[in-house]
């Protein structure tokens, strides 16, 4: 497909999983992956696209296992929120080193570390071409960072949520287990619900559907994929009404 002369989106919400930041490492943050992602975000800013970012925390902390071992779920989720703040600090630093203006906003107050989340301030920053990183999820336990991505996407009136993953999009089945699995180019919200496709948790997905917020799932590990998505190429899977 021919590349459009201009980006097809003006404002996006990029959802990065914590695992994406760990690269080949089993834990933590791979500095080279972080820097590559910062460069890809920089490309979007240079194209005039307004970028909001939500990052997960699974590379640093996973509450599910500890919850099974008896830890209170609320405590585990609070720890997970702090993990996303750590990832957000790392991403903000990588963007600053790439000469990109970026602000980190947290849904839980962490004075002296990052700004408190403010919807109006976030919109203002985006309009001035600042990258805004949203950390600490929704600020509430029992909600995933996918829910946070959809919530922030709706709040900032993003054109789309771009969910960066390790696979090329949404498949009819797990492509690792089933080599015959089909990659979908486009789906409706109803298709995803009826076929019980694994895109996001139900709370996050329903939020996006109810507010007609399109979701595009793509492989962030493919160099240039993010740019191709915003330029309107058929990269990954688009889920819309």
Swiss-Prot record:
Cited function: Catalyzes the reversible phosphorylation of UMP to UDP.
Self-association and partners: Homohexamer.
Residue sites binding ATP per the record: 15-18, 58, 62, 165, 171, 174
Keyword terms of this UniProt record: Allosteric enzyme, ATP-binding, Cytoplasm, Kinase, Nucleotide-binding, Pyrimidine biosynthesis, Transferase
Activity regulation details: Allosterically activated by GTP. Inhibited by UTP.
GO molecular function, one term: ATP binding
UniProt similarity note: Belongs to the UMP kinase family.
A single Gene Ontology CC term: cytosol
Matches recorded under PANTHER family: URIDYLATE KINASE, URIDYLATE KINASE PUMPKIN, CHLOROPLASTIC
One Gene Ontology term from the biological process aspect of the record: 'de novo' CTP biosynthetic process
Entry protein name: Uridylate kinase
Residues involved in UMP binding: 57, 77, 138-145
Places the protein is found: Cytoplasm
SUPFAM superfamilies: Carbamate kinase-like (SSF53633)
Pfam families for this protein: AA_kinase
Organism: Yersinia pestis
Pathway annotation from the record: Pyrimidine metabolism; CTP biosynthesis via de novo pathway; UDP from UMP (UMPK route): step 1/1
Reaction equations catalysed: UMP + ATP = UDP + ADP
Chief location of this protein within or outside the cell: cytoplasm
EC number(s) on file: 2.7.4.22
Region (Involved in allosteric activation by GTP): 23-28
Domain of life of the source: Bacteria
């Amino acid at each position: 497909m021919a590349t459009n002369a201009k980006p097809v989106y003006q404002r996006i919400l990029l959802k990065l999983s914590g695992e994406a930041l760990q690269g080949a490492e089993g834990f933590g943050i791979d500095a080279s992956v972080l820097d590559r992602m910062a460069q890809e975000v920089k490309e979007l800013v240079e194209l005039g696209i307004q970028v909001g970012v939500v990052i997960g925390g699974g590379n640093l902390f996973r509450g599910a296992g500890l919850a099974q071992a008896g830890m209170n779920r609320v405590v585990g989720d609070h720890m997970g929120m702090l993990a996303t703040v750590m990832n957000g600090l790392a991403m903000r630093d990588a963007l600053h080193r790439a000469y990109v203006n970026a602000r980190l906003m947290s849904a839980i107050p962490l004075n002296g570390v990052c700004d408190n989340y403010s919807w109006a301030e976030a919109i203002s920053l985006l309009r001035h071409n600042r990258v805004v990183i949203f950390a600490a999820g929704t600020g509430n336990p029992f909600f995933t960072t996918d829910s946070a991505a959809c919530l922030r996407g709706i709040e900032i009136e993003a054109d789309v949520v771009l969910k960066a993953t390790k696979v090329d999009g949404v498949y009819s089945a797990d492509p690792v287990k089933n080599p015959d699995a089909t990659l979908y180019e486009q789906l409706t919200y109803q298709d995803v619900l009826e076929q019980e496709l694994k895109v996001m948790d139900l709370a996050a997905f329903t939020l996006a559907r109810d507010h007609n917020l399109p979701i595009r799932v793509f492989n962030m590990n493919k160099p240039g994929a993010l740019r191709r998505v915003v330029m309107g190429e058929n990269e990954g899977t688009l889920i819309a009404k």
